[in-house]
UniProtKB/Swiss-Prot annotation:
This is Small ribosomal subunit protein uS2c. GO terms for biological process: translation. CDD domains: RPS2 (cd01425). The keyword Lipid metabolism does not apply. Its main location: plastid. The gene is rps2. Keywords: Plastid, Ribonucleoprotein, Ribosomal protein. Transmembrane segments: none annotated. Gene3D superfamilies: Glucose-6-phosphate isomerase like protein, domain 1 (3.40.50.10490), Helix hairpin bin (1.10.287.610). Belongs to the universal ribosomal protein uS2 family. InterPro entries: Ribosomal_uS2 (IPR001865), Ribosomal_uS2_bac/mit/plastid (IPR005706), Ribosomal_uS2_CS (IPR018130), Ribosomal_uS2_flav_dom_sf (IPR023591). Signal peptide: none annotated. It is found in: Plastid.
Length: 235
């Protein structure tokens, strides 16, 4: 996956394009190559280095059977992220982060259990409900599914959270920091590298940039998953 062509591929996927110099975080200076036409250009050599680091970490997590939650409120990548999570058997949240998702885990778990009840036992009782009760039931199920469908199989707080769009996810970051949940982030030039454990300096606004990174992450997650499957078979 990592070869001589990767920087060229990153360039065409627009990973190098940062924000205008009027909108940046000085803490990202180390990862900037230059300024061009008023925009900061991300150093792709460093992007390769940190992407390798993240991919190796993710592969290790997969081998150990650890679970990752992917979080992004970027509407343009919702379908891709859902598909990605299904393929890698991960969890996802694509709506605005609900305060207390982690810090009030008992309430979150209650909502997940209720959604799963509607999906299984609720269907059995559906025919016995009145028209009004069915309407109320559908509304409640729809509301729960909006926020919890991507984590309905999550039995506990995940081992790692992968954030896409750090500037939109302050609540999620705050809860991860409070509970010492490790995070991985794609960091654009307006982001803060001190607010995450692992990161990839890259354009986090471009769909092509995000998809490029997710494809690498998927490859290493599945690679790690195959190793754990073999280990389970031979043990």
């Amino acid at each position: 996956m990592f070869n001589d062509k990767i920087i060229k591929e990153m360039f065409f996927a627009r990973l190098h394009l940062g924000h205008f110099s009027t909108k940046w975080n000085p803490k990202m200076k180390k990862y900037v190559f230059c300024k061009q036409n008023g925009k900061y250009i991300i150093d792709l050599i460093q992007t390769v280095y940190y992407l390798k680091k993240v991919c190796n970490f993710i592969k290790k997590l997969s081998i150990e059977g650890k679970k990752i939650l992917f979080v992004s409120a970027r509407m343009l990548i919702v379908d891709k992220l859902k598909h990605f999570a299904n393929v890698t058997k991960s969890f996802y949240i694509t709506e605005d982060w609900l305060g207390g998702t982690f810090t009030n885990w008992i309430t979150t778990k209650g909502c997940i259990d209720k959604l799963n009840y509607y999906s299984v036992d609720g269907l059995k009782l559906y025919d016995s409900l009145t028209k009004r009760e069915r309407l109320i039931s559908r509304k409640q199920q729809s509301k729960l599914a909006k926020y919890y469908f991507g984590i309905k199989q999550m039995k506990k707080i995940p081992d790692v959270v992968f954030l896409i769009g750090q500037s939109d996810l302050k609540k999620a970051i705050g809860e991860c920091l409070k509970l010492n949940v490790p995070t991985i982030s794609i960091l654009d030039t307006d982001c803060d590298p001190t607010m995450t454990n692992f990161f990839i300096p890259a354009n986090d606004d471009s769909i092509s940039s995000i998809f490029f990174i997710l494809d690498f992450v998927k490859y290493y997650m599945l690679k790690g998953g195959k190793k754990i499957s073999k280990r389970l078979v031979f043990n």
